[in-house]
């Protein structure tokens, strides 16, 4: 068990070692001989493994072919290709660790690794809670209260929401509001003894409820931001974005304009570590300008295209680095995250830490940088691999009951559910 804890904590750490490789990636890759047995028969894992290998190989080969026309950063090529290979390896670590500790404790260990990784932000960032510490603490707190009464979960979610409210973090606050609304709804449904014949129908019913809760939460956060509740900076940004002709979403994410313009200009992508040429930079700026954003402010040159192509979208970052296989991998990741939440809604007992991590993954697949994703992927994809089929959701109780100690080795019945769906 101690080995499992150490591996899981290390997987949650993204601190760079030599040659710009992260602790998490190195540990995940090195531990494959130990962890492979936990996932070798899991069907949900197979497609993830194949696409990760294909995307990594494509990124490396395209990078080599691009050397005649582009400047290629060797360190960026190495980091990108190995980070793609490390995705299924990190998932294997989580599954292997969860077989021994339970999924909740495995998520807690990864969250603790994320917390250790974010500690330097206390000295380097003006808002460390928003940019790393808050997410790690949220994973840990929600893991700790996952087997507690709903009232305890509601209090924890309210406290976390209050901290994010004063930390100028709109998206995370919206996620917590969605989870809070879901927990309250399930508490009321359980109190009213609401019964749906099958887990599939229950999941569909709760997805509809969740959609309503999500819309209300997002509208509420936008209104709070515009009113100044989230701070003056958030208020100014929201008002400016809402008044733009491109709308709130596109104004808040002008990189989407750059991504679409680059995709139209070069649909097969670039390759890992490739630095854009002047013409690529010009195309990206034109796409951002079309959304009413002024790209002549140094941000595009210094941050988006300073060392490699970074489009603030995991999907488009991996399309640029690994072409179509990279894009398909990210779409698979988003699909697995959504499927994990759907299966969890097959009962009236949502898993808060899974919802928070899955919502974060889905957001960053589409409108967040790839660099944010690796720490969350073991939690979300590992849970997706471990979950039984939706039709068996009604048989589940609370995850990791204290009276049910974790098994040292997975039984055939524990592996079978992941193979059947």
Show where each model-derived region lies.
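Loop-to-helix entry and N-terminal half of a specific, functionally important transmembrane alpha helix
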Residues: 3-7, 305-313, 317-321, 328-366
